[in-house]
Amino acid sequence: MSAWRKLYYNTLNLPLKLLVKSKRVPTDPITELGLDTSRSFLYVLPYHSKADLLTLRQQCLSLGLPDPLQPIEINGTKLPAYVFIDDGPRVFRYYSPDPRKDSVKTFHAYLDAHRNNPHLDIEMLPASVMFGRSPGREGHNGVPHLRLLNGIQKFIAILWLGRDSFVRFSPTVSMRQMANEHGTDTSIARKLARVARIHFSRQRLAAVGPKLPARQDLFNKLLASKAIEKAIEDEAKAKKITLDKARKNATDIMEEIAANFSYEAVRMTDRVLSWTWNKLYQGINVFNAERVRQLAQDGHEIVYVPCHRSHMDYLLLSYVLYHQGLVPPHIAAGINLNFWPAGPIFRHLGAFFIRRTFKGNKLYSTIFREYLGELFSRGYSIEYFVEGGRSRTGRLLDPKTGTLSMTVQAMLRGETRPISIVPIYIGYEHVMEVATYAKELRGATKEKEGFMQMIRGLRKLRNLGQGYVNFGEPISLSQYLNQAVPDWRDDIDPIEPQRPSWLNPAVSALADNIMVNINNAASINAINLVSTALLASRQRALTKEQLLEQIDCYLQLLRNVPYSSDMVVPDKSSETLLAHALQTDKFQVEQDSLGDIIILPRESAVLMTYYRNNTIHLMVTPSLIASIVLHHERIHRDDLMKQVELIFPLIKAELFIRYEKEELPDVVNTLISELCRQRLICCADDGILRINPARIRPLQLLAASVRETLQRYGITLSLLNFAPEISRALLERESRILAQRLSVLHGINAPEFFDKAVFSTLVSTLREEGYLKDNEDILKADASALYQVIAKLMSPEIRLTIESVGVTEDNNSAQAIEENPESNMDK
């Protein structure tokens, strides 16, 4: 590098060091993109900008990557280590005025070098730099993305947006592979430049999103749609009002629903949240984000469908996506959050509000459906919670399919952009609402969201541990429909909304697939593991050595027999995980002369079931195997398999387990082998499985994870055994009553133990599996064999309590128990 050029770069670099603090996407490109820092890279930038080049250089040097300003020497010839694909503003034009020709020339020089040197392999590393990510407004002729700003404008942009800049690294491309597969002539060099240009264009659209419409223009377009025009006419006729009044009602609904996205609001909120997360959380862990970035770059319309644990989910996911180089989505939020000042803030951050129910309100449902379709057609990513509300128990709720159904209907409008649904697992080491959830499950009235509740909630924001966001396996909507409904395209109508007969069953199956994929992406943390172990102990206490032994048991199971390829298991030791969990002040430590005892306080037991339930689906199958071996003490492998196959459909439906019936034998055999390897059970050559007395405690604790689930099944099956002909409503009610009684008598702390939805799911599954038959409102049961299998897996005292209570028609006693469900929680 000449002295003059070095002076130029050093001079230009001075203000950049002060003004620019760029973020990397991905955060760790060395690991996520598999970059080898010992190799040489040709850095490919989208357009000519020395500010971008020097910003990239800062990040490269901090990562230990080669210096972009240091030429690469090949056989005595020095070639530049960077190339600009397109033109851009420059103060000094000592280069050729046409970077397009320069890029082709540089690519050809590298390809030619690879032709002459068979052992050479330079990798192209695409990298783009963005200062600000405002998409602009429709109808404005402003220059997009700072692409053609002159030197002064660029300086002002850097001055204002230097700390909102991103350096996006993309996967490398091997020049050796290009030369071998496509040749080395000039046409290949031109093709490389053209492909790079398209790559950067798509990448920028994924990061910035389409231009935003003026809100009133959007309303006018919606009002002009045939579906809404007809709904307005029907509204006027039904309510006997004028068309103008009906149109005013429609506009009011649009005002209530529609987002008012603002880039400046996102940018300022990002600064606040960055400070907030650093103060409140010890870290936000993000996994598998590259698959979403790739979908966005490939032009997919993305629907983010996370599980719903907390109000924090809204902010956390948008924050994570923004820092992954993606445009924050438009978010379907409950109308309960539309209060001052949260409502206007959320609306500027992309939230659109949805009522809890709009059954029977044709005008509202039509407007909401058309608004959702308009978001899709404009290319905005969307986020909604398919569970419909926050889980109060920590387990996934049964999905609500209304918005998902409208998403499928958007496909039936004939839009060409592919729609991909991305299930997302969100996990926390501390959920600030968990105490409120416990009160609501005890029967307390849900407190209405408002300004004062928000202020009280802010006071609880401290020591929140770590957060986890794991992007699950995407579901291509068109591919799903091709498999589920091969002729679905016959129902495409760009004007009239369609509700074909296949819609409801297809959407229900799709919703279940989404829930399974969310569970597949579970991210296990220290609180999940410690809570699971301590709650498995009847006294909610273990010595430190026992607890470490049990955490090790869980970790080995999860690592050696992974539930899915998307799940995340901590790579830390059990000692490190326990030390971290104890720092959260959720557990007590008592010391005596023999060592430490870790205790889960009685008042905290109900709260900690939430964190156990987040990942209970990972443990339930090995726990069932352990429970069968433990209670039988000696059982043949084939008999164990038969029992698992009988019980498993109930567990699969309740917890959205991924295993299909055909793969269950292989899964069970693999888990048995792992339990034998850990010496929890003994496996003989003749197929007999026995308990290992030397390792009985960890086997008991492992088996305990499924204990309450089996007890709940035993309750319903016992009632069916006692009264084979019973109405569904009475069966579900009596099951809940008996579960509440059992929890009081035996100190069962799990709030979901008598959850109405859980028993409803159980009865539905029993019906689907053929154990129940509908005869009008009466169920006819044939489930005695299943009950006998499950009854042998319960303790004698639990079984005695269950079987001593028959179905009672005494509504007074039933009502007394139902009106006081919190009695168990106070024990």
From Swiss-Prot:
Cellular localization per UniProt: Cell inner membrane
Lipid metabolism keyword on record: yes
Record GO terms (molecular function): glycerol-3-phosphate O-acyltransferase activity
Chemical reaction(s) catalysed: sn-glycerol 3-phosphate + an acyl-CoA = a 1-acyl-sn-glycero-3-phosphate + CoA
EC number(s) recorded for this UniProt protein: 2.3.1.15
GO terms classed as biological process: CDP-diacylglycerol biosynthetic process; fatty acid metabolic process
Lipid bilayer topology: Peripheral membrane protein
Motif (HXXXXD motif): 307-312
Listed pathway(s): Phospholipid metabolism; CDP-diacylglycerol biosynthesis; CDP-diacylglycerol from sn-glycerol 3-phosphate: step 1/3
Alphabetical keyword list: Acyltransferase, Cell inner membrane, Cell membrane, Lipid biosynthesis, Lipid metabolism, Membrane, Phospholipid biosynthesis, Phospholipid metabolism, Transferase
Main localisation: membrane
UniProt xrefs under InterPro entries: GPAT/DHAPAT, GPAT/DHAPAT_C, GPAT/DHAPAT_LPLAT, GPAT_PlsB, Plipid/glycerol_acylTrfase
Keyword Transmembrane helix assigned: no
One GO CC term, this protein: plasma membrane
Source superkingdom: Bacteria
Record remark: domains: The HXXXXD motif is essential for acyltransferase activity and may constitute the binding site for the phosphate moiety of the glycerol-3-phosphate.
Family (UniProt): Belongs to the GPAT/DAPAT family.
PANTHER family in UniProt: DIHYDROXYACETONE PHOSPHATE ACYLTRANSFERASE (PTHR12563:SF17), GLYCEROL-3-PHOSPHATE ACYLTRANSFERASE (PTHR12563)
The name this protein goes by in its record: Glycerol-3-phosphate acyltransferase
Record gene name: plsB
